[in-house]
């Protein structure tokens, strides 16, 4: 993948993970001086910080959705969409269908990890219901917004560009993975979000979405992914 496309993926991943990264802190230094090894899976959440982490994460997600909506009418943001498209397409030598499969990768990974003995927060039935709720909210919201906004795709194929459904699906799956394994290791969530950000970058590489579509889809996916867990927790 070209440098510009990778840079966009990195920006998306950093923005989406800002709340998660700020909620992680290492244990106090209570080990003996002779201890030289450290397991990253043992990172713990600071209670004072983790209390505010969901609010911070949802604020970041809401900001991404708001950016997507603003770009529908704001000329400077539309111009940024066009310049980003031009830069990416200048180096796009081929199209790929990897994004059609990568959008599901974090969710598939959750079930694969459980199958090999790396247990998440919920059993098969509960996590399936949680993910089902998230997907239902995400899919319904995405279809509704596409029909209401009628933003033309960069390739001119139709008027269903905003928000990116692939990106929303990928980030909902990434948030699902993060929530399932946040008490095991933060690196599972980071991997899920990296896959989601790559999905968004590939949608632009394939000339199917504007940058603002990707930002809006990412924010929507994070929000609906988290909503599935919140809905189940209240039952």
Predicted regions and their residues:
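N-terminal secretory signal peptides that target proteins for export/translocation
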Residues: 1-2
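Juxtamembrane helix-break-helix junctions at the cytosolic face
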Residues: 115-122, 180-183
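Membrane-embedded catalytic cores of phosphoryl/pyrophosphoryl-handling enzymes
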Residues: 146, 151, 155-235
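Lipid-exposed faces of alpha-helical membrane segments in multi-pass integral membrane proteins
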Residues: 62-66, 102-112, 133, 137, ...
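Hydrophobic alpha-helical transmembrane segments
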Residues: 57, 128, 132, 190-191, ...
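N-terminal targeting leaders of membrane proteins
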Residues: 5-13, 17-119, 130-131, 148, ...
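Mid-length scaffold segments of soluble, non-membrane domains
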Residues: 129-153
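Extracellular loop and loop/strand-boundary signature of outer-membrane beta-barrel proteins
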Residues: 92-94, 122-130, 157-160, 205-207
